[in-house]
Amino acid sequence: MTLPNVEWAVSPGLTPYQPALAFMEARAAAIAAGEANELVWLLEHPPLYTAGTSAKAGDLLSPDRFPVYETGRGGEYTYHGPGQRVAYVMLDLTRRGRDVRKFIQSLENWLIGAAAQFGIKAGIRDGRVGVWVDRSGGREDKIAAIGVRLRRWVSFHGIAFNVDPDLSHFGGITPCGISDPRFGVTSLADLGHTVDMADFDTALHLAWTEAFGPVRRADAPELVPD
């Protein structure tokens, strides 16, 4: 039986941002050159903020609270930290018809499918990137963010799903540039679901196979320290 070319790796502990970014860029280049397999890489970061290509300076409300990193992904400011599952998705879209819209829809379906395994009805919203859930009083909260970049038709960056992060840490930014008080952030824990990261990863893996197809397990990347 031929093994799938997409690898699935999970890094333990907290992964520093800059070595992770350097690895992603190198791996994406190797995939584009036909020298490496595609990869879905799951990790957690220490508390930090990242700025996408559309980030506005005024949306960084507490610039000294956590480290801030400029990144080439799409989107605005977001928070990463413990209790949030980040998945960096390095896929060759040339092998998938170079259909960016379909790729983003598949990422959305992946996250919606993972949430559904915990009884959470999540969905997308017109004009607002990511995956959202309805709350009381007409509120809607984001449970997962999407921000990707393409280089030579290979994706990198990816998604961030709030399992049980400290939601107060989002207060140092205007998340994704949305200041309307009707729209906030939430997590599995905030919605009343106590889920450890290993169990969430199992749900994420199953939802991936439904949205994208099979993967094979791989060792966590070895990173070059800062």
From Swiss-Prot:
Keyword Nucleotidyltransferase annotated: no
Disulfide bridges in this chain: none
Positions of the record's site feature: Lowers pKa of active site Cys: K142
A Gene Ontology molecular function term of the record: lipoyl(octanoyl) transferase activity
Predominant subcellular localization, coarse grouping: cytoplasm
InterPro entries membership: aa-tRNA-synth_II/BPL/LPL, BPL_LPL_catalytic, Octanoyltransferase, Octanoyltransferase_CS
Pathway, per record: Protein modification; protein lipoylation via endogenous pathway; protein N(6)-(lipoyl)lysine from octanoyl-[acyl-carrier-protein]: step 1/2
UniProt KW keywords: Acyltransferase, Cytoplasm, Transferase
GO biological process: protein modification process
EC number annotated for this UniProt entry: 2.3.1.181
Cellular location(s): Cytoplasm
Pfam families assigned: LplA-B_cat
Domain BPL/LPL catalytic: 34-216
Residues annotated for substrate binding in this entry: R73, G74, G75, E76, Y77, T78, Y79, H80, A145, I146, G147, G158, I159, A160
Catalysis: reaction(s): octanoyl-[ACP] + L-lysyl-[protein] = N(6)-octanoyl-L-lysyl-[protein] + holo-[ACP] + H(+)
Active site: C176
GO CC aspect terms: cytoplasm
Note: In the reaction, the free carboxyl group of octanoic acid is attached via an amide linkage to the epsilon-amino group of a specific lysine residue of lipoyl domains of lipoate-dependent enzymes.
Protein function: Catalyzes the transfer of endogenously produced octanoic acid from octanoyl-acyl-carrier-protein onto the lipoyl domains of lipoate-dependent enzymes. Lipoyl-ACP can also act as a substrate although octanoyl-ACP is likely to be the physiological substrate.
Family designation: Belongs to the LipB family.
Protein name: Octanoyltransferase
Lineage: Bacteria, Pseudomonadati, Pseudomonadota, Alphaproteobacteria, Maricaulales
Name of the gene: lipB
